[in-house]
Design a protein with these regions (language model features):
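Conserved ATP-binding subdomain of kinase catalytic cores across diverse folds
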Residues: 10-16, 20-23, 33, 37-93, ...
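Long, low-complexity segments enriched in small/aliphatic residues
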Residues: 185-255
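Basic, amphipathic N-terminal segments
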Residues: 3, 8-11
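Short intrinsically disordered, low-complexity coil segments enriched in acidic
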Residues: 1-4, 143
Length: 415
């Protein structure tokens, strides 16, 4: 963005880009003759993962076209690198499919709806995120046996929701646009049907119950008077039970060093808070689809006593799949890349976000495991509800891009 340009100038810039990159140029895609082998791209990702978890990744991706898509961010990033680009950049998610949106607690304890996965985040073309979001609705609709007309409508709802939200942000002050956010209460109030309002309220109530104390009962058990994370291989495996990852005591020491580094990345006030806790156990925990096989841990921390738990997730951060077609991150530490990107894109972020290094040059980021986190079961959504959800996702993605990009130029291009 040119700082001296007026809003009218910036909007005109977006409109002018239509002449060189027509909006219709985004409508079609066909694989080039030299397209990278999709299977080879997935296999390449597998080489540095925990090999005993790779089959789980493959089985989860094989469940349906949509679940394959969830794990295929690298394939799509490689394909998008050869598509027309507006040249308008923003901090982008890199994996903005519909299941990477959800609810969680803001630091002010509001339940808000936002993007919740930033493993691939990098500055890049805003339209890449929008294309990944729109395509995810096509595939989810097909998996749900939704008709073609409804699929077109829900996909259009995502794009129009983005377009209208971006236009709306140009009418706000800079600060108002920055602070804009969607709460579950706002979403509930906006639902036109009573049964839809009831569904959101039920989901919100379920999410409110998700915290570290509930997770303690689900993920841990008392052993000799002390809570320890349960062993539920292969999806949940404490360090003490890892099959081939080295000496458990040494792994524990690495974890403690990593924890100390992580605390050093927090703001002073939050470091004071985390210093009130100590780690009592750590385990490998399988999460998601595309992330399966990366080194993802959960740490059980204890505050005043064993009725005062805190669960943190410690997730390996590797190079963004977007680096296939974009410059490398300005951050050499990929954990920091994820955290800084998340803070820039989200309306409100987890107070415990931070990063650290492990052994062998690996990088990680830390966040709360459960803090009123909620998500929708897309497989059970009707076409009508998918359309509503698509509009919410479109608004949310537009807001994430407007925070770092130029809403006037993007809105000018979209019209």
């Amino acid at each position: 963005m040119v700082e001296s340009a007026t809003p009218a100038d910036r909007r005109a810039l977006g409109e002018a880009i239509r002449k060189t990159v027509p909006r219709t140029s985004h409508a079609a895609w066909s694989p080039p003759g030299d397209r990278a082998d999709p299977v080879a791209l997935l296999t390449e990702q597998d080489t540095d993962r925990l090999q005993w978890l790779v089959p789980i990744r493959h089985s989860r991706m094989a469940e349906s076209a949509f679940t394959f898509y969830r794990g295929a961010a690298k394939i799509m990033a490689t394909d998008l690198a050869g598509t027309p680009s507006t040249g308008l950049s923003a901090q982008i998610c890199g994996d903005a499919h519909l299941s990477n949106f959800g609810s969680f607690a803001s630091p002010e304890r509001e339940q808000i709806f936002d993007i919740n996965d930033f493993d691939e985040t990098l500055p890049g073309p805003w339209e890449w995120d929008l294309k990944r979001l729109a395509t995810s609705f096509v595939l989810a609709g097909r998996d749900n046996n939704v008709g073609d007309n409804d699929i077109r409508e829900m996909t259009a709802s995502a794009v129009v929701g983005y377009q209208q939200a971006m236009a709306r942000f140009t009418t706000m002050t800079t600060l108002d646009a920055w602070y804009a956010h969607l709460t579950l209460q706002q979403i509930t109030d906006a639902m036109p049907k009573k049964k839809d309002r009831a569904a959101v309220e039920k989901s919100a109530a379920k999410s409110r119950s998700k915290g570290s104390l509930r997770a303690l009962g689900k993920l841990a058990e008392k052993v000799d008077g002390t809570f320890r994370i349960k062993s539920q291989p292969p999806l949940l495996v404490p360090l003490r039970d890892l099959p081939s990852e080295g000496n458990p005591d040494e792994l524990g020491r690495v974890a403690e060093r990593s924890f100390a580094q992580y605390k050093g990345t927090l703001d002073d006030n939050r470091r004071v808070l985390i210093d009130k806790y100590r780690i009592v156990d750590i385990a490998v925990k399988v999460v998601g689809v595309g992330s399966v096989g990366t080194r993802c841990f959960i740490a059980l921390l204890e505050g005043n006593d064993d009725t005062d738990p805190l669960f943190l997730q410690v997730k390996e951060a590797t190079a963004s799949v977007l680096e296939t077609g974009l410059p490398r991150s300005a951050y050499s530490h990929h954990g920091q890349r994820v955290v800084e990107g998340q803070r820039l894109m989200q309306a409100a972020s987890d107070i415990f976000l931070g990063w650290s290094a492990g052994d062998q040059g690996r990088t990680f980021y830390w966040r709360q495991l459960y803090d009123m986190k909620g998500s929708v079961d897309v497989s059970k959504m009707s076409a009508r509800r998918l359309k509503v959800y698509a509009t919410l996702c479109g608004w949310t993605l537009a807001h994430a891009h407007a925070r770092s990009g130029d809403p006037f130029a993007i809105s000018g291009y979209l019209g």
